A protein has these predicted regions:
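Membrane-interface "cap" regions at the ends of multi-pass membrane proteins
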Residues: 1-60, 196, 205-209, 219-231, ...
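C-terminal membrane-solvent junction of multi-pass transporters and transport-like membrane proteins
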Residues: 19, 23, 387-464, 471, ...
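Hydrophobic, membrane-embedded alpha-helices of multi-pass small-molecule transporters
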Residues: 27-46, 161-168, 199-206, 217-280, ...
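Selective recognition of specific alpha-helical transmembrane segments in multi-pass small-molecule
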Residues: 41-45, 68-76, 111-123, 189-204, ...
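Membrane-water interface regions at transmembrane-helix termini and the short interhelical loops
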Residues: 54-56, 81-83, 98, 106-108, ...
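Transmembrane alpha-helical segments of multi-pass small-molecule transport proteins
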Residues: 108-109, 135-175, 189-198, 228-247, ...
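Hydrophobic alpha-helical segments and their helix-loop junctions in multi-pass secondary transporters
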Residues: 124, 128-137, 190-218, 239-240, ...
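Membrane-interface loop-to-helix entry segments
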Residues: 125-128, 160-204, 264-268, 376-385
Length: 484
């Protein structure tokens, strides 16, 4: 491995993109157990659960669907992170094996250069609003600072809280996995206290019976709920489409495959059991208690009389936003941008570039047209299911769980693998799978497929890629050598 690392360094690759050494791969199962809790318990996910009630599903079915979703999420994270844990290589480099050295730039740019940066900015802005609430409860006069002052539509208090929250997020991004691990170790018990406590509070207010019987006003119970049950599972799993694609950014640090597999599986299942119970109890209980349907946990917390309880709850919600932003956005963006120019940029350069762009796009302005922005990001996110399908089929079926690292760490200008650096089979399959999974957003008769888009994208891409490779044969010498 040391000889390979030296060779790849001579080819111009930065330390951040090289295969990790044995001493660097020190994440144990517990590190992965705590990694994703904050990404499960965040404001958008709770709002999403409120939307599930609109479908007319029973409270029990919603909870069951959420828990089952955890199994699919864990499978995607573990299996697509298998190559990373085996070879200690980040997602940006592993993607080259599936799409080609040049071909990997397109899906990689979508993941780390567009979706991650836009979501990073939007999450920073959303978190700054919660931060504004937090400061306003302690110092009400802060909310009127600057009077009518506006900078690009942002008030002075809004600008201050946004910049502070942005700096905190960037700092976590610079620290990478080491800082994130320490952060999540502190965050996890706080999540149990806050969201577990909120669930107990809701049950004590209205009782478990009314919560289990809850339906929003004007909504009738669904008669045939089988397909809707699958729609809920797809919605929960689809949130993880981007993190699952870039799972190797975290599994590259794993002590072993078993460590990341055991840690991620147990961590996600435990997190989602708590989330399933807490989200349903909090949303249903608060809606019944306040006499109006309310699905945003921040709106619920703002109604509390206890300053300490609301302060602590909002603080933990802010911490979950930071955790989500780090794992899902800024860390993958840092690696991917570094991979765009591996001889000139490193991970921290990538983080800084992504962070600055997230400022320049003025996320508070984007939120003024949030329906269009979310549709755009949904379409990009919908492409990640097919990408996962191709990556899984390539690694497990074509390569039989082996990687030719020389195929990934080629010298600058060396595109001998695939068709001038592009795996055309992978691109063709991805295009077809994207059309089938997202076509329903524009073509009415395909709408049912779009409601289960993640499953359609992954399954179609996996099967089609495996069959085409079996029929057409291998396209590069690395495939022939390792799979032959």
């Amino acid at each position: 491995m040391e000889h390979q690392r030296e060779l790849y360094q001579q080819r111009g690759y930065s330390e951040d993109l090289l295969p990790k050494t044995e001493t660097q791969r020190n994440w144990k199962a517990f590190n992965y157990f705590t990694l994703w809790m904050g990404s499960v318990h965040n404001v958008p996910n709770y709002v999403m659960v409120g939307g599930f009630f609109i479908l007319g599903l029973s409270t029990f079915n919603i909870m069951l669907a959420i828990i089952i979703s955890a199994l699919f999420i864990a499978a995607a994270m573990v299996m697509n992170g298998a190559a990373g844990s085996k070879y200690g290589v980040p997602f940006a480099m592993i993607l080259r094996g599936s799409y080609g050295v040049r071909g990997a730039l397109f899906p990689g740019l979508l993941r780390g250069g567009i979706a991650a940066i836009m979501w990073f900015g939007l999450q920073c802005y959303a978190g700054s609003l919660a931060f504004l609430i937090l400061i306003g409860k302690i110092w009400p006069g802060f909310l009127t600072l600057g009077g009518d002052f506006k900078l690009l539509g942002l008030s002075l208090p809004g600008l201050i809280t946004f910049l502070i929250f942005w700096i905190i997020n960037v700092g976590i991004g610079f620290g990478g996995g080491k800082v994130l691990n320490k952060f999540t170790a502190i965050l996890n018990p706080c999540i149990y206290i806050v969201f577990g406590g909120m669930a107990i509070w809701a049950i004590s207010l209205v009782g478990i019976g009314p919560i289990l019987d809850y339906l929003p006003s004007g909504v009738q119970k669904a008669e045939h709920s089988g397909f809707l049950f699958l729609v809920v599972i797809n919605a929960v799993v689809a949130v993880w489409a981007a993190p699952a694609v870039s799972a190797s950014d975290f599994t590259q640090n794993a002590h072993s495959f078993r460590a990341q597999a055991l840690g991620q599986t147990l961590g996600l299942i435990v997190a989602y059991i708590l989330f399933a119970v807490a989200s349903v109890c909090i949303i249903a209980g608060a809606s019944i208690h306040y006499g109006m349907d309310t699905w945003n946990v921040l709106d619920i917390v703002q109604r509390w009389d206890s300053l300490f309880a609301s302060f602590f709850a909002v603080l933990v919600i802010l911490m979950t936003t930071i955790s989500t932003n780090a794992t899902g956005n800024i860390i993958p963006a840092g690696y991917q941008i570094a991979a765009l120019a591996p001889t000139k940029l490193n991970y921290k350069n990538g983080v800084m570039i992504a962070s600055i762009i997230s400022l320049l796009i003025c996320p508070w302005k984007l939120m003024e047209n949030q329906d269009s922005i979310y549709l755009f990001l949904d379409i990009i996110g919908g492409m990640f299911g097919p990408v996962i399908g191709v990556m899984l089929a390539h690694y497990f079926v074509v390569m039989r769980g082996k990687i030719n690292l020389d195929e990934l760490y080629t010298a600058s200008g060396d595109y001998k693998y695939y068709d001038n650096g592009f795996n055309l089979t992978a691109f063709s399959v991805t295009l077809v799978a994207v059309i089938l999974s997202l076509g329903g957003k524009f073509i009415p008769f395909m709408e049912p497929l779009s409601r289960v888009s993640w499953f359609v994208g992954v399954i179609v891409a996996f099967v089609a890629y495996a069959l085409l490779k079996k029929r057409t044969g291998f396209e590069n010498t690395g495939e022939k050598k390792l799979a032959g």
